[in-house]
Amino acid sequence: MPAQPLRDILEPGWAKALEPMADRIAAMGDFLRAEIAAGRSYLPAGQHVLRAFQQPFDDVRVLIVGQDPYPTPGMAIGYSFAVAPEVRRLPGSLENIFQELCADLSVPRPTNGDLTPWTRQGVLLLNRVLTTAPRQPGAHRGKGWEEVTEQAIRALAARGTPLVAILWGADARSLRPFLSPAPTIESAHPSPRSADRGFFGSRPFSRANNHLLEQGAQPVDWHLP
């Protein structure tokens, strides 16, 4: 992750929203460069660490919170739950998200795990922690990313424009106090370990669209190629 001013690496709205975290983001960059210097790599690739903050801040209308990047090399691309289109064997969580998407909206199963079409419609796919070590889930928890993403979420809620938050799992649900007055949709995490405990059947996509309509906003076209 390059050592640059926020205005040079983030979308202008995000650069302003995250200005209170400029020192923390710089410190996280120092941490990642120290990891590389010590012979330890991290995921996702440096140019994708802050990818979620490169889409327009003012356009965000749905927030989907993940935990941290996929620890399998070649999968994490800077968006929660998404993988590159060439990844053929999808993570279990994403398979379950697609299963619920098809059941909720009666749409065909997506052909790959690229969720970029959602981001183009104002869906922010944000991990609570933005990096991890290869094959070590949660390796960078408590290092400082939580402060950054908390500020991002507070800034979104403070805009006073339509917003719906989809919170899957206990980690994501802990962010509810920072999201008021935005409506939240909460359930178990889509992980294969927990999806049967309330994720399946929760209909998050249709419910999110209903909340958007109630706020006078256009619904999201959740269909994926």
Curated annotation (Swiss-Prot):
Gene Ontology CC annotations of this record: cytoplasm
* Annotated Gene3D superfamilies: Uracil-DNA glycosylase-like domain
The record's subcellular locations are: Cytoplasm
Q: Which SMART domains match?
A: UDG (SM00986), UreE_C (SM00987)
SUPFAM superfamilies according to UniProt:
Uracil-DNA glycosylase-like
Q: Does the keyword DNA repair apply?
A: yes
The EC number of this protein is 3.2.2.27
| PROSITE patterns tied to this protein | U_DNA_GLYCOSYLASE
What's the catalysed reaction?
Hydrolyzes single-stranded DNA or mismatched double-stranded DNA and polynucleotides, releasing free uracil
InterPro entries, per this entry? UDG_fam1, Ura-DNA_Glyclase_AS, Uracil-DNA_glycosylase-like, Uracil-DNA_glycosylase-like_sf
Predominant location: cytoplasm
Gene Ontology biological-process entries: base-excision repair, AP site formation via deaminated base removal
Active site at: 68 (proton acceptor)
**Entry keyword set:** Cytoplasm, DNA damage, DNA repair, Hydrolase
Q: What functional role does this protein have?
A: Excises uracil residues from the DNA which can arise as a result of misincorporation of dUMP residues by DNA polymerase or due to deamination of cytosine.
**Protein family per UniProt:** Belongs to the uracil-DNA glycosylase (UDG) superfamily. UNG family.
Please identify the protein, giving its name as recorded: Uracil-DNA glycosylase
